[in-house]
Amino acid sequence: YDRCTVGVVTGIDPEATVPEFDIVGAEQMYSVLRTQVDVVLPDGAAVLDASDPLVAKMASLCDGDVVFYDTGAGSQVVDAHLATGRRAVLVRGGRIVLATGERGVPVAELSRLEIGSNGEPRLDDLLAAIATSWALGIGADLIRTGIETLCTVRSESNETVVA
């Protein structure tokens, strides 16, 4: 394909190589994976893992918007991005939040989700999927329903409810 609406890069494994094509290090893998960001349309978005410095560096290559995601709190990359009024999916106060600038809309309580066990998605993978959905224009209510459908949800009484 020539261009795309949403391009996603979830990480660069520094050990990943493709020696038969002379890709023998992280910087060379960066050059390969950056093409996914290079082809994002001006009205599209790149979804990037803010916790991976090489992936975060790709933001400047995008013709469209950038939606960062990060499992940690206080990421300088995310904080600077939000300070410009842009979007990020992050964990804040035990919640998964869709943040735009200083505003945030919670879409899930982490304490109510089974994450990273028994075949459930890992948190970083879940955040990437949420960020991709949001980049495609899907609203918070539908994203919330998707999370509850994908993950096992604990009720208020801590009983496991399979959604």
Q: Language-model segments: which ranges?
A:
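Short, small-residue alpha-helix embedded
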Residues: 125-135
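Short, conserved micro-motifs enriched in small and acidic residues
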Residues: 116-127
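Fold-independent oxyanion-binding glycine-rich loops
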Residues: 10-12, 49-51, 58, 69-72, ...
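Flexible active-site lid/hinge loop adjacent to a nucleotide/diphosphate
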Residues: 1-77, 110, 116
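Gly/charged, well-structured mid-domain segments that form the phosphate/adenylate-handling core
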Residues: 118, 133-163
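Beta-strand->loop->alpha-helix junctions that form or flank phosphate-binding loops
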Residues: 64-91, 120, 146-148, 158-160
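Acidic-glycine-rich active-site phosphate/pyrophosphate-binding loop
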Residues: 86-110, 156-160
